[in-house]
């Protein structure tokens, strides 16, 4: 097992990475101080890993309940969030009740938001079961739900007590979900660590094959990078925004098609292709680097062309982006691998990128 620490002073927490971790009682015990625990999971994950987690919690002598939600991005909304609150109130959960998010990014985001809101804040633990949630969404305290007009527009910054990333859970992950997670690994290397990007290029086929040692390194390095960014800029006042490379275009794709039509990582992968093209058009990134970026995204079996929503629709959707100011869209742009710029772009350049990268 490898442990990466997120250094946030008295709110610091560990990220445990390895195989077989869901069943290890000692990873959960230090972070559960009340008399009850509520596991929040979904209809896909609970049959796979719910019993193992409940067995790990049994020696602690806590009252354990489970809220099982429908699976999918389409359910990341107020109605589903209320199912968590219904479960907590039915069980008479109190301020010391610990929530455990067992699932992918949707479960983690909603459980964290529920934890931030219930009784104005209760502790929670992330147990991410997808690659995307292990390398990205479970770390950093971003929680929330979608709105029909924009992704993740309603939420809170609320840090977990711990993250338990069990690599063994990736064995049951569908290929599309694996590729979606690799997209976030690629993003992390592209924005923050050129050497890590080189490693991803050399190992993308091994990632596709789910080789355990390669997966462990991908999760470890991605978490190290994200932890350092979050420690420096917890609430996205500046530096942390670089983690949204590919997300401005990607969120527009998700909202434009309807949440769940494309996986989040698929939209981010395609969004990176778009952002790379825009970076070249603005004279920031060289063409050879853009081609390398596109090639590794394609090798990860991710889409490299966006849906033809129309230029006006893309622009409207991107103006709802959280980075936008007074209606001006800000993009995360690449200067070279490991070096980014956050800036607006002329509409003509964005239109040209959309014309080239959508079908």
Curated annotation (Swiss-Prot):
Pfam families named among the record's database cross-references: DHQ_synthase (PF01761), DHQS_C (PF24621)
Cofactors (names): Co(2+); Zn(2+); NAD(+)
CDD domains: DHQS
Main location: cytoplasm
Superkingdom as given in the UniProt entry: Bacteria
GO function term, MF aspect, one: metal ion binding
Protein name as catalogued: 3-dehydroquinate synthase
Source lineage: Bacteria, Pseudomonadati, Pseudomonadota, Betaproteobacteria, Burkholderiales
